[in-house]
């Protein structure tokens, strides 16, 4: 019985255990269900400082995709569990995370993120808070440049900054272009003169010129030589107040490029690569006639009727039936049409004398140009840091194919930059920044300097192929340049630039008083080689024609060596003066030394081996050697004091005392001061009512002067060039020289004085920003040619500080940026638009005859003179009647041709009954009037950026509103 009872007991216990387990599971399910239950949680989001509600703030349940936004009154409602965490985000505020903790009402207080306004901006020899700026400075984040698929940083800057204009003369990746900030700089100005029915381009020297100063980590450099992926920020100093601390070097504005350094305390390796396919916007091959017969008929119709006029109707072609070519077996057009009718597309035939006769269908642009070409970029970056050491190494390889289908057309670059900083003690740090840039460019070229378009247009005709059936070159193949490119005519450029800066920083009082000293050395080694090879055209199997002969051939080489050294010592004092006072004082010394050497060698009349080691080994008949050297130095003492009171009233003065060896001893030094004031109205007590929507409202004004010493090192010296006579005497060329142009002993700096007023404003937690400036710039003591000397003197007019110029302009920038929740990720977007305009006038020029084709007092830079019109003549009868009534007998363009239908109706401005140019002066310019200006007006740039979940899209538009 005990045994049986034991079994029953056991069964009972097992049943109870199973029941317990089931009950436990049910309780767990109930508990889980209760835990997972989402309840409505509501609350109000307010601003910590103003206690105002924040509308449009994003509320998310952390770790989920559940979210909502606040209503106009700042309220919200969201489904959340008792233990969930709410994440609240809004542009211009710090992100807040709040535990629900079982509450049904959760209010959230957002704290303003002052990073946008308090961010530091790179300025000359230091940094300032954005709120302390009173000059015209625009700062760009490096990410704005890396998003653009350009090999050259200068192209990426185009349209990003109001007042910054980068002029590109072509689309080559190697060309940086000329960088202008706020309008025309003094330089060589081209005008187009027209007299007696002929046109002539003339260039007049007007000032020293020079592009904006580009400093890469404090060392003068080229934007085309910096890796876009390695840029931390770019600051553009546009007015005299901002650039005065750079003195003469900053006369045309300053661009400060700061490269990236190591961040954090971990070792990172990153790689990025891209491939870009470029397609020509204009496809010439689609716009020309490539059918040989059609081209011939069109050409001959024009050719046959080129002398046709209503007065000479016998010259008007009635039919295109014949075209005789010397040596052709019969009429060329007849032969062409017969071949086409028979389906014979063989382009080769023969004349009776055995020379070739061609019947091709050649698309010459398709031979010369690729429909598209590619480029690739590879970036590798290594960065790391510890408590005492920071290091980074960044490299880039860029390879771009050229546009041409033939010859060697390429551009390759390699960038490498290393940065190391060691904290030796708590008051001493040392650093080194070394960069290397190497480039190689190959390009086809004509020895005559003509463009491919000129040569191809004249000699690349549809019926004429570039090569004969046996592979030799045709006459068109040679004269178009095709043969030269295929045989090795070309130009090859190499560039190696190494820059190294070593510096030390002593913190006497941390974050208060520090001394920075550095020394930089830059070596530039450039080489250019050019070749012209003998080329022969075969007019027939036994009829060679040497186009470029053995005697015409040459190989040449240029080497350009530049060594640059600079030293800087900068003392910075930023004392802690309490909440109501901010003081930033900078003082320093700068020394620069430039040395330049050029060597040129050319060997003519040689047979080229495929590879050559030295010019001495060439089998040549003539050798030419040239060399020249130059050097100059600059030294400057500078200072800046920036003070703000109550974070409302800002005052700044800066100055530089510059010395340059380019000027005579008595004129080598110049003093260039500036002063600025700013007023932050938003910080005034009576503006508290605007705190909820106005973040910054600053008006500013400044004036300052800068010197421009961008002249050649020996301009102040009267030099005598030695040349050789072109006509030999006694069987040899002799040396000769000419009388030098006199140089005034008072030759000195050009001085640029700028006046600027501006407004900066930020609204809605810096989502909406506006900046505007109006400026007036006076350039005095411009170096240019003086009054003409008597012919008996035998030399050109001397150069001196004779002229002056005025530039006026304005610029505005408006931007909007925001972030909204899209799914579980932020969707960030920004829109930025810039518009600017500038005009320049010659306020004084030492000319007395008022020639409108030259510079004169009152001339607007870029102005164009021409005839004005009043439509076209609709018929020959109207043209003849008009000519008879007004006494106009001839066409202005060609005195031998009467006025005809389609000719322009020129307006007789001076009413003398004829169309003429007068004497081409301001007093007598006939019927000429100012009809336009070549200076770009109303330049604009629009930037659109979007990003979401690691996916980005950037769009950029730029243009000219008027020209």
Task: Tell where the protein language model's regions lie, with residue ranges.
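C-terminal extracellular loops and terminal segments
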Residues: 154-160, 797-806, 850-864, 925-945, ...
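Extracellular/periplasmic, surface-exposed regions of secreted and cell-surface proteins
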Residues: 210-211, 419-438, 446, 472-532, ...
């Amino acid at each position: 019985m005990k045994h049986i009872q034991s079994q029953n007991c056991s069964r009972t216990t097992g049943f109870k255990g199973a029941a317990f387990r089931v009950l436990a599971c049910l309780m767990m399910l109930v508990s889980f269900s209760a835990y997972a239950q989402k309840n409505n949680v509501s609350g109000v989001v307010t601003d910590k400082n103003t206690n105002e509600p924040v509308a449009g703030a994003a509320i998310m349940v952390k770790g989920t995709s559940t979210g909502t936004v606040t209503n106009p009154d700042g309220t919200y409602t969201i489904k959340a569990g008792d233990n969930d965490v709410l994440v609240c985000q809004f542009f211009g505020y710090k992100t807040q995370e709040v535990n629900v903790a079982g509450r049904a009402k959760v209010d959230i207080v957002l704290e303003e993120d002052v990073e946008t306004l308090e961010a530091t901006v790179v300025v000359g020899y230091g940094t300032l808070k954005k709120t302390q700026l009173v000059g015209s400075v625009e700062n760009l984040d490096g990410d704005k440049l890396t998003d653009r698929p350009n090999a050259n940083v200068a192209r990426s800057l185009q349209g990003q900054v109001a007042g910054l204009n980068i002029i590109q003369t072509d689309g080559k990746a190697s060309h940086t272009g000329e960088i202008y900030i706020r309008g025309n700089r003094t330089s060589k100005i081209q005008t187009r003169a027209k007299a007696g029915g002929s046109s002539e381009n003339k260039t007049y020297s007007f000032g020293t010129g020079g592009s904006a100063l580009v400093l890469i980590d404090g060392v003068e450099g080229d934007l085309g030589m910096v890796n876009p992926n390695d840029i931390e920020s770019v600051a553009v100093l546009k007015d005299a107040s901002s650039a005065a601390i750079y003195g003469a070097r900053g006369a045309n504005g300053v661009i400060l490029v700061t490269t990236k350094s190591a961040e954090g305390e971990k070792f990172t390796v990153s790689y990025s690569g891209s491939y870009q396919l470029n397609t020509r916007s204009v496809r010439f091959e689609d716009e020309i006639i490539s059918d040989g017969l059609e081209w011939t008929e069109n050409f001959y119709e024009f050719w046959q009727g080129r002398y046709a006029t209503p007065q000479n109707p016998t010259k008007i072609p009635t039919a295109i039936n014949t075209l005789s070519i010397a040596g052709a077996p019969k009429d060329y057009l007849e032969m062409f049409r017969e071949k086409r009718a028979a389906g014979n597309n063989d382009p080769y035939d023969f004349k009776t004398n055995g020379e070739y006769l061609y019947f091709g269908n050649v698309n010459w642009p398709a031979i010369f140009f690729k429909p598209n070409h590619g480029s690739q970029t590879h970036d590798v970056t290594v960065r790391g840091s510890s408590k005492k050491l920071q290091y980074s190494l960044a490299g880039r390889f860029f390879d771009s194919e050229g546009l041409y289908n033939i010859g060697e057309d390429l551009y390759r670059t390699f960038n490498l930059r290393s940065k190391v900083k060691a904290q030796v003690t708590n008051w001493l740090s040392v650093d080194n920044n070394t960069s290397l840039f190497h480039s190689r460019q190959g390009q086809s070229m004509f020895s005559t300097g003509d463009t491919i378009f000129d040569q191809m247009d004249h000699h690349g005709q549809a019926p004429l192929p570039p090569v004969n059936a046996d592979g030799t070159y045709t006459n068109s193949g040679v004269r178009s340049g095709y043969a030269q490119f295929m045989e090795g005519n070309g130009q090859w450029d190499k560039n190696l630039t190494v820059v190294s800066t070593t510096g030390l920083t002593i913190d006497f009082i941390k974050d208060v008083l520090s001394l920075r000293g550095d020394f930089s050395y830059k070596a530039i080694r450039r080489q250019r080689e050019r070749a012209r090879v003998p080329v022969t055209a075969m007019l027939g199997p036994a009829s060679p024609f040497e186009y470029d002969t053995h005697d015409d051939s040459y190989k040449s080489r240029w080497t350009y060596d530049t060594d640059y050294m600079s030293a800087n010592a900068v003392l910075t004092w930023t004392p802690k003066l309490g909440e109501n006072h901010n003081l930033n004082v900078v003082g320093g010394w700068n020394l620069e030394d430039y040395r330049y050497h050029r060597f040129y060698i050319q060997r003519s009349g040689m047979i080229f081996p495929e590879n050559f080691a030295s010019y001495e080994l060439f089998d040549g008949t003539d050798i030419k050697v040239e060399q020249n050297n130059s050097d100059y130095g600059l030294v400057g003492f500078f200072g800046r004091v920036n003070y703000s009171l109550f974070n409302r009233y800002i005052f700044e003065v800066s100055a530089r005392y510059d010395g340059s060896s380019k000027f005579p001893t008595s004129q080598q030094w110049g003093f260039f001061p500036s002063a600025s004031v700013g007023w932050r109205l938003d910080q005034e007590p009576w503006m508290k009512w605007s705190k909820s929507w106005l973040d910054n409202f600053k008006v500013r004004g400044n004036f300052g002067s800068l010197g421009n010493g961008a002249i050649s090192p020996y301009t102040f010296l009267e030099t005598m060039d030695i040349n050789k006579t072109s006509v030999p005497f006694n069987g040899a060329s002799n040396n000769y020289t000419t009388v030098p142009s006199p140089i005034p002993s008072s030759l000195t700096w050009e001085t640029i004085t700028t006046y600027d007023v501006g407004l900066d404003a930020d609204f809605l937690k810096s989502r909406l920003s506006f900046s505007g400036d109006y400026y007036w710039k006076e350039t005095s003591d411009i170096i240019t040619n003086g009054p003409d000397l008597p012919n008996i003197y035998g030399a050109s007019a001397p150069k001196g500080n004779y002229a002056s110029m005025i530039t006026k302009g304005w610029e505005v920038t408006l931007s909007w940026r925001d972030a909204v929740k899209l799914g579980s990720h932020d969707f960030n977007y920004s829109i930025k638009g810039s518009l600017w305009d500038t005009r320049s006038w010659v306020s004084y020029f030492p000319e007395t005859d008022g020639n409108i084709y030259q510079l004169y007092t009152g001339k607007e830079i870029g102005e164009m003179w021409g005839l004005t019109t009043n439509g076209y003549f609709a018929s020959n009868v109207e043209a003849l009647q008009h000519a008879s009534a007004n006494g106009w007998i001839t066409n202005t363009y060609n005195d031998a041709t009467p006025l005809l239908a389609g000719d322009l109706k020129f307006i007789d401005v001076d009413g003398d009954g004829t169309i003429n140019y007068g004497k081409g002066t301001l007093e007598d310019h006939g019927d000429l009037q100012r009809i336009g200006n070549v200076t770009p007006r109303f330049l604009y740039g629009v930037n659109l950026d979007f990003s979401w979940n690691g996916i980005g899209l950037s769009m950029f538009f730029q243009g000219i509103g008027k020209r």
